[in-house]
């Protein structure tokens, strides 16, 4: 799903520098002998970090936008689910965007914030039934891909609870009897892996490609910003699940229900994958109850397919407003101070409908010996300790030794 255009690659090393998977980038030479960095799809986790930093447009991605639009025009019955990050991607006109999609044939569009509320409820109930169990959050599919490929010893800790997207889709199918195909609108490239594997959602349409689609169909976003839209999500609206896109969103939701949980967060490719690699080396007693992790440094609002990147100040302002609004919606308890939304979930939902099992990916590991690394360093002209420890990062790797290992 991450695509590569060799004609545009200048081997600037930016993709290597940000990639959490050293083996996902392969050094090759084109027919003219020019060095290029291709992609090994078996080792790629689809985090999209390389897409965000490639200023030459050599890296891009595929989603399901064209297939979705073609099916819609053929009359295929489709309903939509939309990630709450839509308010960040289409700031000031998200209702108009979804109204356009609905007018063009999508019968209903549901709010994934509601699925995020189900996700929070399922985590709380799961932890109550499994006291002492340590969980790694899984709403981020790039994180799931990384654990399944490179941190398989941590797989037993990966939360069995479905992501908010899948919780929403399961609810539509099992509880509302929805039979139409489901399109998910998201800022995430890697969601496509999750959808293909589970078979619950039929199309991953990224916000970036959705915006391009609207422009091709004559939508003027400046005009859309000034036009009042009456669009409303179908079905039950979400509450605190609307804060999931921000870093620590799951943590905030879980702590509202159980403030005694030990939850720590990590996000961004610079740190989260290092922390995941350390996770299984830590004594069980030192692990948090929940490790809330996201691949993107500012959460889903900075996803690789969000479209135009928003300033951290504007993003924070929007998310704070969303949180304040939804906190006022949520403060509705019964006489025993129990959350009414969760009481309703307890009556209607079965937690087993919202869980999944994971299998490790069959990734062939390449074992490099110290002797091979030493030999490669010598071939690279690095014969002294000083030369072997320049570690200037210009090649994209953190150390000279890491580069020699990759080569």
Task: Please identify what each model-predicted range represents.
Residues 1-2, 7-11, 43-44, 287-289, ...:
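Short, flexible, mixed-charge glycine/proline-rich loop motifs
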Residues 4, 10-40, 45-65, 304-309, ...:
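Iron-sulfur cluster-binding cysteine motifs and their immediate structural context
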Residues 62-407:
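Iron-sulfur-associated redox domains of electron-transfer enzymes in respiratory
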